[in-house]
Amino acid sequence: MASGDNVDYEAVMVDEFDALNIEVRVSAGPSSSVPGAALSAPRCPGMRALPLKAPVMSTPVPAAAPLPTPPAVDDGPSAVGVGNVPPAVDDVPSAVDDVVIQKETTKYSAKLHAAKVADELKASAGLVFLPGEPSRTYEYSDMGPAFSSNAATSSTSPASTSLTPRKVLYNGRVPSIKDVLAASDVDEVRHMQDLPAFLHAYAHQHDKATVYLLDASQSHPALVDNARVHIDTAALRPAMDEARVTKTAHEIALIREANAVSSAAHRAVMRHIRRFASERQVAALFTAECTVRGAPTQAYAPIAGSGPNAATLHYGANDEPLAGRHVLVLDAGCEVNCYASDVTRTLPLGPTGHFTPEARHIYDLVERMQEACVAAVAPGLLYYSLHLKASAIALRGLLRLGILKGDEKAIWAAGTVAAFFPHGLGHHIGLETHDVTGRDRLLLAAGEREPRAKRDAVSAEMLVGLAAAVATGPPYRGKQMLRPGMVVTVEPGIYFNKDYIEGYFLREDKHRAFIDRDVLARYYPVGGVRIEDCILVTDDGYENLTKAPKGEDMLRIIRGEAQ
């Protein structure tokens, strides 16, 4: 660290296991004129704790039951409503979405998180040393990107080392040691100038103790070449990842609140969508609604894709007009105190508030896929069996619509349905939108993932492999079973991405024979449909944390028939 840099940390003592969490703020750059503020701001400012509900604890997982046969799709595409609708109502928030984040006083459960990591490390003593992320300025500038820390080290802001009147003038007061102790369940907080002495003392008092680092670059001069301690850079990352798979009651409360805010913002978009002319308006309203409710940070960049853009899984331009298009896919969620939500709704476009016939067919199919999968969530279930269930429902629905043709078993064996359902059913959610899975994979033991993508890519070959794995039965090595305390998304979708379908599937005889091009051409303008909720696995089933309306409830709001 350069002279004058300010570094803060919090120390957590849990019996004989010490977890040391360091938050770093560095003012850098050749021409920076901003005083080193050392605010040690966490990844999302204003970290706080919420009142806890009943704890949701991880319990022994029963043996996986045989994969149930996906239910047959016994209802055809529903009729499309027509007729005049009343004008859109004024945007007066109703009680159901009048959600505003309030500052709480209960403590962040730092000791519990440290204890979970210690348990995964199988360690009764040791030191976890976690440097935080530095804040930086652009080269030759006094400005820089918004500060965001590694999700694994997000924490409350500890006290500054050198608070001066000038720093207060520029940046305001930072939390005192007393403030930090009041905000977090920790036993001791010190100023950063005490860190070298603390580490030297620890090494002398705990001869041959293990110091756990995420990687060697995160060490400290007081630890380098210190013969009194053993440095372990291999065990901490998998232990922390596994500890994050099941959430504490405090974490669940934060995810629930993030979903409440996001659901209210989605509802606001529904009330306005008939008056909007561009994707920009949709994205702007969503983020504004989150901000005024106290959750200004988005868990990921909002996706507001209309028409063909709805077929791009991670569309981000959000800059095209809505006129003449069938649907808008709005995939957007805020975060609260670093915990994410991830919510997707598909809205009809146009003045009537009704889906076009083709869009309604696809929406109803995706709705059936999601409802069946959510209803099946329970402890002990292999999550990837839900993906197969959704794929089977999609196959039968696309056969019924005539987009697919031929023998159902032959189409399934070829994996052709992946042309239209090309991504995984969902993912963990928590400190990150696409949260860590721990030692096992939620969906694929080894699969392609786009950089920074939220979804596993599922090719036809991967789908066939998943089905074969279920058919051969246990052991399910590397496949993750659902456990109480997990929060996962369930987000099936059907897409008509012309480049993808024609670039891969229509070029191969084994797929081309099962796709009716004439019928497919009628559905290309739909673009795509996705519906996504965040689902908490409970001891006896599940809780849907996402309250954004969908289906007929959504359509009534869009048409101004309900709030």
Curated annotation (Swiss-Prot):
Statement: the UniProt record of this protein carries the keyword Protease = yes
Keywords of the record, alphabetical order, are:
Aminopeptidase, Hydrolase, Manganese, Metal-binding, Metalloprotease, Protease
Taxonomically, the superkingdom here is: Eukaryota
Reaction catalysed by this enzyme: Release of any N-terminal amino acid, including proline, that is linked to proline, even from a dipeptide or tripeptide
Q: Which cofactor does it need?
A: Mn(2+)
Details of cofactor binding: Binds 2 manganese ions per subunit.
Residues that bind Mn(2+) 1: 342, 491, 532
Membership in a protein family: Belongs to the peptidase M24B family.
- What name has this protein been given in UniProt? Probable Xaa-Pro aminopeptidase PEPP
- Which source organism? Verticillium alfalfae (strain VaMs.102 / ATCC MYA-4576 / FGSC 10136)
Quote the gene name from the UniProt entry: PEPP
